[in-house]
């Protein structure tokens, strides 16, 4: 059986990098050993952060809200997987600080892929619009993305399979004592 205390897995990376895909794989694997919730950035924007725009302040507020909900869930033994672009290092550091002050383990996972791969994956054409100047405030094109300096885990989704990324995260959780060997297998 998995650990009864909760934790926060914070997946950050540009749009199309594979955060949602990896979060679904993590949920499927972890759900057999503990309660798990995914806080997906797109869903949070629809329900919890409706009305926020894409200014720096609004993006920081969105990350704060996700972090607050993640802490509440983790405090009650839920394994939380937050998958959000969360473009600013200071916002991610604040979420980590608040989690760790509350005694909640926090694992930052950087899901990364080169821009040309992200453009090729972009079925909505958002990168194309942003590069053409038709879409303002698009992270990684017209707005900055501050890549983590020292993430706990890095997944290169252009070369790593979903399974390889999943294994890398599970191995990190096991090494940190957040999963027992059975849940990590």
Curated annotation (Swiss-Prot):
Its EC number is 2.7.1.25. It catalyses: adenosine 5'-phosphosulfate + ATP = 3'-phosphoadenylyl sulfate + ADP + H(+). It holds the Pfam family APS_kinase. GO terms for cellular component: cytoplasm. Keywords: ATP-binding, Kinase, Nucleotide-binding, Phosphoprotein, Transferase. The active site is at residue 86. GO terms for molecular function: adenylylsulfate kinase activity; ATP binding; sulfate adenylyltransferase (ATP) activity. Catalyzes the synthesis of activated sulfate. This is Adenylyl-sulfate kinase. The gene is cysC.
